[in-house]
Amino acid sequence: MTRTYDAYGNVISQKSRSFRQDGYDRRYAWNASGRLQNVIDGITGGRTTYAYDAVGSLMSACYEDGTDDYRMPDAVGNVFRSRDRRDREYGKGGRILRDRHYDYLYDVEGNLILKTPRRGLTQHPNHEVSEESGTHIAWQTGDYAYEWYGNGMLKEVRLPYGKTVRFEYDALGRRTAKLFNGHVFRYLWDGNVMVQEWHYEEKDRPQHSIDEFGRIRMQGEEPVENLVTWVYEEGSYIPVAKLQNGERYTIISDYMGRPVEAYNSYGNVVWQADYDVYGDLRNIKGIRDFIPFRQLGQYEDDETRLYYNRFRYYDPRIGNYISQDPIRLAGNNPTLYGYVGDLNNWADVFGLRCKKVKKIGPSIPEFHRKNFTDGIVNMRQVSGDEIFYKYHGKSNRLGREYNYVTNKKYLSEQALREDLALLKEWGVKIEYVTTFKPQAGTWIGEGTAAKQISQDGTEILEGTGYQGIINIKELPNSTIIKTEKVKFSL
């Protein structure tokens, strides 16, 4: 996977290759505010264009097939799927009350308890119902019914056809089990990341008992079958590999850390997807839940189509959580139920607080960008096999934060000055050249040298030669191969 960045640190291209075959290939364009304007598929040429409101909230996308997808926010952050914002009704705190397909009913704590195609089941202005008030509505075929633990975690979901999905958690709110259709799905965590999961038949699940000291004892061994191990990018929530049955699947994620492709060990694509403006999957190839991770921190349950988001569950079909933010307004989300304003830049890893997660590279100051043609500097990380040259004087100006380099040796000083537009009035004496080989991962800004005109107008140099800018000061001494006196042959 290779990425290039502009001078502001925004990723402008991302490519992956497998066994010398082109894989994921995207080009990105950003506006002056750092918001994603469009994405071009480098293989098909398809373009997706995004639009934002005055405060930077993502409000629509026009996909490569010409279809529009709306996520229109109102003044308080509630989102609508129609351009005229007439397809939904909202209540206090941003809870959705009604859309084109369902009515939504809540308990007194603000947790969603019924999603039903039946209309007009309550007259309460915020659709609150409860057994205590005698307003509880029973599940019927076609409904989704939700039950909650006392700590606000989702306990179970009864599906429209009658089957029930149940959930269990540890004391830290990490989900440890899901029970559905006679099977137990188990999860093992390392801190805040899920590292393993497996499943087996519910009849084989060991029973638990409490001894005289209050300790929980497991009666027998728990089966470990169909084990899946997840590998993550170091220090992050971004999955990079799936290990299952002796096979390793490589996961490719986009600049936000969202999985977009998975390859088997033969280099074949086994899973592929894009995302819509609500974070739901589009253009899926392969089995949907083969890779269950979505926005950072989210894990999709195929049975409910909800995203488990640690302390809450997100519904990508409506763009809302189904319960209030446990930390209320401190979460900094648009509403108590709302997800982040801009899904192309922000995420909510724990279902508590939104934060900017867009992966960026280093930026280049405006003063240096002016020395590149049209101010265009593309940032990338070197491979570790590349050679660069720094031409300089006796002072050996390698200690500066930013150093200009080239990728070739010059036979004449005139050619060097013309390509790099080095004016005589600057007093730059070319006496030495330092050859160095930066380690893999070192950032370099690249472009072509900008045209330069002397103050009196008598010297004009067009530039246009390759020009790089790099922080040599931070490079280990081992990267410097040699410094020698320049010997031009022409």
Go through each PLM region and give its residues.
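Beta-turn initiation residues at beta-strand->coil junctions
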Residues: 1-7, 13-20, 38-44, 60-66, ...
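Intrinsically disordered, low-complexity Ser/Thr- and acidic-rich flexible linkers and loops
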Residues: 19-25, 118-143, 203-222
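Surface-exposed extracellular loop regions of Gram-negative outer-membrane beta-barrel proteins
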Residues: 25-36, 42, 47-56, 112-118, ...
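A motif-centric feature for acidic-aromatic and gly/ser/thr-rich catalytic loops and repeats
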Residues: 26, 74-75, 85-92, 245-310, ...
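Short, low-complexity export/processing leader segments characterized by acidic and small residues
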Residues: 262, 280-282, 312-322, 326-327, ...
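Catalytic toxin/effector domains delivered as secreted proteins or via bacterial secretion systems
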Residues: 354-490
